[in-house]
UniProtKB/Swiss-Prot annotation:
This is NADH dehydrogenase [ubiquinone] 1 beta subcomplex subunit 10. Residues 1-10 have a biased composition (Basic and acidic residues). Its main location: mitochondrion. Keywords: Electron transport, Membrane, Mitochondrion, Mitochondrion inner membrane, Phosphoprotein, Respiratory chain, Transport.
Length: 176
């Protein structure tokens, strides 16, 4: 159906209400109010905002590039040095978050490869699968059984237990 019709064939019926006269003796106050609002409020605010945006565009700060200096490990802290222990704990927490992000990235790569390759993912994604297993093993060795109240001290104790178990297994292998 066409959007417009032939006005010669189908004329519009005459309107029963009189057409409003656009010319009045009094001007419309709403137009004056909107112009006054634009000049008094909107224009200065827009001008200031554009100025601020230009200044921010010149001096853009990239927050994700913040680099923290490495602090000593908790094993290097003296026994009563609370500040050193606190800094080592915060460094360990940052390392923990970085390791979590690395795990997420490797997992996303493996999922993308599995999605892309379909049923043949074990053959075609062997490199990603091997990398994922290595990273997962290292992550689990370090952080798996720390519990909800994890800390650098608990992680260090877990690492010590793991090293003792490895030494014991190596001694038993050498003896056998």
């Amino acid at each position: 159906m066409p959007d417009s019709w032939d006005k010669d064939v189908y004329p519009e019926p005459p309107s029963r209400t009189p057409a409003p006269s656009p010319q009045t003796s009094l001007p419309n106050p709403i137009t004056y109010l909107t112009k006054a609002y634009d000049l008094v409020v909107d224009w200065p605010v827009t001008l200031v905002r554009e100025f601020i945006e230009r200044q921010h565009a010149k001096n853009r700060t990239y927050y994700y590039h913040r680099q923290y200096r490495r602090v000593p490990d908790i094993t290097e802290c003296k026994e009563g040095d609370v500040l050193c222990i606190y800094e080592a704990e915060m460094q360990w927490r940052r390392d923990f978050k970085v390791d979590q992000e690395i795990m997420n990235i490797i997992q996303e790569r493996l999922k993308a490869c599995q999605q892309r390759e379909g049923e043949n993912y074990q053959q075609n994604c062997a490199k990603e699968l091997e990398q994922f297993t290595k990273v997962t093993k290292a992550y689990q060795d370090r952080y798996l059984d720390l519990g909800a109240y994890y800390s650098a001290r608990k992680c260090l104790a877990k690492q010590k237990q793991r090293m003792l178990e490895e030494r014991k297994a190596a001694r038993q292998e050498a003896a056998a």
